[in-house]
């Protein structure tokens, strides 16, 4: 059923969100709060820039991975027993559209911290409320025409709207202090993520037969592909200077 499709898709993308957004946000908030108390502008800029960089470093490739390999992922994890090919395809569609919102979901966790660190809880509350209202409104308006798939579409779309609202407010209030190098790093992350995507597409095509619905060891082959592609991405990021030891020290 549609509820099951959304449930299984949600379980998969929540794992990516926990790593890309929640983990970075949890670590950065207390350090950022302390920096604001000290009024240390250089430290604030450093923490904000590194938080966004780490968030995008993890969320952009995760997003592309879910979009490109949604069917193979769902098939490998749940394509057994009473879970039919139709169930795999429907769940994969939901996962794909959730995938488009992964960077936004992660960024929301980071950008809201920039307000929380200043003891401003009202702005994140109102933006969260707006996201929920927009999400529900889009889902209700288009549900009859599009079906259950509008729910992940609305979720991703409304979250991106929230990100843009955060960005506008942070810029207008001059709460955003970013290093100039951040934009260069974002360009590198996008470039490496696109390159990783081509490698992933190539690998999925090569092992297409082994990832078939009837294959007994499809989960093993998918795990090998994920490990290979992830290793390629991380090594590439290290070689171009994105993965330095100091990059993980948010202070």
Regions found by a protein language model. Name each.
Residues 1-251:
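Membrane-embedded alpha-helical bundles of multi-pass transporters/translocases
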């Amino acid at each position: 059923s549609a509820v099951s499709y959304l449930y299984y898709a949600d379980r998969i993308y929540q794992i990516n969100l926990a790593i890309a957004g929640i983990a970075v946000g949890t670590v950065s908030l207390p350090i950022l709060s302390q920096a604001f108390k000290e009024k240390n502008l250089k430290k604030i800029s450093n923490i904000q820039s590194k938080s966004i960089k780490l968030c995008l470093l993890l969320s952009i490739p995760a997003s592309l991975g879910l979009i490109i390999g949604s069917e193979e992922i769902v098939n490998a994890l749940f394509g057994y027993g009473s879970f039919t090919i139709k169930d795999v395809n429907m769940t994969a569609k939901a996962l794909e559209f959730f995938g488009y919102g992964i960077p936004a979901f992660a960024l929301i966790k980071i950008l809201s911290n920039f307000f929380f660190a200043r003891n401003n809880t009202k702005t994140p509350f109102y933006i969260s409320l707006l996201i929920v209202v927009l999400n529900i409104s889009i889902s209700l308006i288009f549900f009859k025409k599009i079906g259950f798939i509008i729910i992940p579409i609305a979720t991703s779309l409304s979250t991106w709207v929230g990100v843009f609202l955060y960005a506008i407010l942070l810029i207008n209030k001059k709460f955003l202090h970013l290093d100039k190098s951040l934009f260069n790093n974002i360009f590198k992350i996008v470039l490496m993520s696109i390159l990783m995507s081509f490698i992933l597409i190539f690998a999925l095509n090569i092992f297409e037969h082994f990832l078939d619905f009837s294959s007994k060891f499809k989960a093993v082959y998918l795990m090998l592909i994920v490990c290979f592609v992830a290793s390629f991405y991380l090594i590439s990021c290290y070689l171009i200077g994105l993965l330095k030891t100091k990059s993980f020290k948010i202070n």
